[in-house]
Structures are given as C-alpha cells and as structure tokens.
Amino acid sequence: MRVLYLHTERFSWEVKEPALDIRDEPVSGGASNALVVFTTVERGDVPEEGFLRQIARDIVEVAEKVKASSIVIYPYAHLSNELARPYAAREIVNKLYEVVKSEFRGEVYKAPFGYYKAFELKCLGHPLSELSRSFKPGDSRAEKKAEERRDLYIVITPSGEEHDPAKFNYDGYEDLKILVEKEVFKRELGGGSEPRYLEYMRKFGFEWEPMSDVGHMRYAPEATLMMELVEDYAYAVAKSLGIPVFKIRGTNMFKLSERAIESHARLFGERLYIVESDTDLILRYAACFQQFAMVKDWVISYRQLPFGMLEVADSYRLEQPGETVLLFRLRRFYMPDLHIFTKDLAEAMEVTFRLHEAIFREIGKLGRTYVSLYNVTEDFYKAHRQYLVELARREGKPILVRVLPGQKYYWVLNVEFHIIDELGRPREIATFQIDVGNAQRFGIKYVDENNQTRYPVIIHTAILGSVERYLYAVFDTLARAEKEGKAPRLPTWLSPVQVRIIPITRDNLKYAVEVADKFEAEGIRVDVDDRDETLSKRIRDAEVAWVPYICVVGSKEEAEGVVSVRERGGGQYRVKPEDLIKKIREDVRGYPNRPLYMPRFLSQRPTRS
C-alpha cells in the first residue's frame, strides 16, 4: 500500500460520477484541520488485521504529531502502477478506515470508493505537512503467526476425554499422529519420492494441459469416462441421504459488483480467478454462488426442509504454481457440491449425522478410512461439545478439534476428512460445513410454521470430495496395494474397459464380435483386440491396461460356446459368456453405468505418444 499524507487547513470532496461497478454510497463531505490520507491499495495487499493495524498506527502517529483534529481516508488510485483488484481494494480501504477509527480519538472520515470525485484542499505547508509511505504485508507476519497460535487444538476421544495433542498417546492411532504433526505442529511428514499414482494417471489419460494455465488438466477418453462415472455416483450418493435433492446446472462466472458475490469472495481471499470484461467477473471456486443465486428466488416453506441441491461445478482456485499436484491440487477441478438447506442449527446437526455416516461408508468401500479434523468456532464448541463427542464415538477413534476464537467465519463447523496417502501425508478428500451466514448474505429465506420469515442454516458438503480427489483416493489405494505386492485393480464399475475379447486368430474374430455383442447388450463395457499382434502381446497390453476380465477366444472356445477368462487378481477359468455377465453385473450392483467412450476395435484407436 502506498499513502500520501497531507496536513490540511481544510479539505472537501464532491462525488461526480461512478468510476467502477464496485463502489460505496456516493457521499460528499469535508473536514477542517485534517490529515488527509490519499490511499492506493496495491496488488499483494491483504485485509489482514496486523497489516492494517500497522498502517493505522502510523497514520494516527502522524496525525498526533501534526496535531490534526480529524483524519480523512481518501481512496486514490494514482500512487502506484500495481493496483489491487477493485473488490480487494475496497475491502482493504474500508477495513483500514475501521481500524483507524478504533485507534484515533478524533473524527475519522472516509471518501467513497469507486467514484470520480472533485476535491479542494489548503495544505498547511509546515515541514511535516507532506509525507509519503509504502507498506508491505510481510511486515505483519509475526502478528499473524501470533494469531494462529491462539487457536486451540484438542484431541477428543469417543468417551469424551480431552487431551493435549502434544501429550496424547498415539499408540494404535498412527494416522491421527500424522495429521497432528501437520496441522498442530506444522511438520510435513512423508514424501521424498514420486508417488506411484502418477504412473497410473498417465495410463488412463489424466494429464496436465501445457497449452493452458498452470494447474489445468485434460482428460483422455478413459479419464473422461471415469470422471463422469464419479459424477453420476456423487448424485446417487446424495439421493441416498433420504432427503429431496434437486440437481441443477449454471454458469461459472459471477459479477463482483453484486454485493453478495463480492462479500462471499472476500472470505475466500487471494486465490480468486478474475476475468476482466466490461465488468470484473469472478470464476466460481465452488457451486455456492450459483446455487444460492437460484434458491434465493424460490418460495420455500418449512414443510419442504430439509432439501438438497447438487451441481457438479467446474471450480477455479488460483493455487500457487509450485503447489499444484496432478489430480489433487488444481486450478480447475470438478466439485460435486451438495448444499442442504435446513430449518435451524439443530436440524443441520441432525442431518450431518447422516452425512458423516455416508462419508465414512463411501471411503470404506475403497478399503480406506478417514482421520478427521474438526474446525469449530469457540462459541459452537462451548455450546455443542457433546455433538463432537458423538461424532468421535461414531468414528470409533479419537478426533482432532481446532477451536478458533472470534466470529470471523460464515461457518460454525468445518470438517476435513483426510486419508493418509502412500507416502504418509494427510490428504483431505471429503468435507462438510455448517454455514450460518450465507442465507442472509444472499437473501435465502423460508416461512416457518408461525408464518414468520427465517433464514435457513446451510450445510456444504462434498461426500466423495471433488471428482479428481475421489479418483486420487482410488489410485492411492491401488498404489498401497501394489506396494504390498498385490496387482492393482480398479473397481469394476470404474474400469474404462470391463471386458476385453482377444481372438487367437483372425478366424476367431467373428465369434469374438458375437461374444462382445452379448456383453454390450447387458450394459458392460467391452472391446475387441483385433490388431495384427501376437497373442502374448495383446494379453500383455490388456494386463497393462488393468482390464479386469480378459477373454481369450479360439476355435475350441467357439466350439464349446465359452470364453477363457484371465481375471485380474482372480486367476484363470473357462466360463459361458452368460455366467460371466451375471458375475460382472453382481460386481457393479449399486453403481452407475456408462457406455464405452472409444471405438470397440483397438485397430481403430490411435496410440498416444
């Protein structure tokens, strides 16, 4: 931030016309014996308490030295070429004004942000009447760290006991210890080598897109199919909660000039994607904007609550270039974002028990479990500690709780569910939050049983996590299996190709196609390797592709009406196609299905370089 101090005998301003879509109320004004602070907010400035208090104290110190009876904060975009975005600049100027008011004993004024203004001044002309300053956010890091240290971390057991994380006995709870090391003591463990899952990503066509921005992926046909299957499954899981769920679709760009959007965006901080057009637009970082913008126009009765709304939202977060991780930490990803609208906090807490059960059930289907971090506000912790104990009891193991002082959050509870990955690192996958602020921010209302207008409490959740992170958990599970000497095998419902038919010779191709037709008619994804390659190479290629059922057919199989099956991780056997179909249908029961996203015949597919 750059500021210019002018000690004036008199100063006045008059609002002329809007300069920005994001602006304050158009108020003209003036002051006598005023220290006028021409204020330019620069890129990289943050609305951080320590940073703003540092600036405010300097302003007040100068005002007291020159014996000014008032201070005027005057937004001024002409002291730097590195300007902050308007929404960020306005927030910082407004917060600076509030901090200066709390520090100064005289009158404090603020000229409105976002307008062309005329001003008149008479500078007093003494040695301290004209001063300039430059402030950097880094100077306030010590205060920020001190603020972080005020957060209280507690380990809560299923029996309700509380423990200091530094003194807790972690025997039998090694995963919790890893999470505590990272979250409480800020020690990142594990790593040190390339994770095995990256090799799997290349196999199925999950790749960075080098012609786009950092952190953007592309998805080959196999990867696209897997992504869309997970999207379908996320909707099915949401419907399994036993509440009505509405699935929607919307835009990914929203105007920062909308007060609710701008206010919500400020909560997210610096990781925003901004698009410059006729007006500043933000790329959404979750489905919140679209769902809330839609629901605010609905007429809702208490009888219709709770209900959910789901969108698989393409989401954008401006992660640091060195922090992006394929399939895990991305600048653009897909979030099956479910919001559940409830009457009040009590109902929201009751619904979260169902969510909690679903979250652990789904990760359990992958053969994994979570270790949990519960971020709670201090007031919520004091009022609802027993609720957290109940969640620990349901998990059957201790949980880590972080108690945050103050009321600066729109949520009262934000739960992170972590797996410990192949390299021993905590990796957040699923989440839920209880939100008590956004209904009022966006104007979402319902009518209660007494015909009174109320604001619902909103649960945010991704039961599976983002689509990419769910697949990350799948592939990390396979990496752990391979580390233990087992052949990695995708769940059959997620396998891009579920059955591959390999004719021994060209003479057997007709029978291979007939068998493939039977599988396809039953909704099973099947292809045929009709390439002019040796049988051993074609079998090997199918194994490398992790096809769960490789069916070799020759003259003998054709005569007997069977296929010779090589089941991944399950041995070899001969079976009629109809019996294998029954086995596969049982294997994929309860999961979504989509057709093959590639030509059936391998000879028609180009190879990737």
Swiss-Prot record:
Zn(2+) binds at C288, H339, H460. PROSITE patterns: AA_TRNA_LIGASE_II. It is an enzyme of class 6 (ligase). Keywords: Aminoacyl-tRNA synthetase, ATP-binding, Cytoplasm, Ligase, Metal-binding, Nucleotide-binding, Protein biosynthesis, RNA-binding, tRNA-binding, Zinc. It catalyses: tRNA(Thr) + L-threonine + ATP = L-threonyl-tRNA(Thr) + AMP + diphosphate + H(+). Residues 1-143 are annotated as: Editing domain. It is found in: Cytoplasm. Binds 1 zinc ion per subunit. Residues 195-491, 196-491 are annotated as: Catalytic. One of its GO terms (biological process) is threonyl-tRNA aminoacylation. Its cofactor is Zn(2+). Catalyzes the attachment of threonine to tRNA(Thr) in a two-step reaction: L-threonine is first activated by ATP to form Thr-AMP and then transferred to the acceptor end of tRNA(Thr). Also edits incorrectly charged L-seryl-tRNA(Thr). Homodimer. This is Threonine--tRNA ligase. It comes from Pyrobaculum neutrophilum (strain DSM 2338 / JCM 9278 / NBRC 100436 / V24Sta). The lineage of its organism: Archaea, Thermoproteota, Thermoprotei, Thermoproteales, Thermoproteaceae. The gene is thrS.
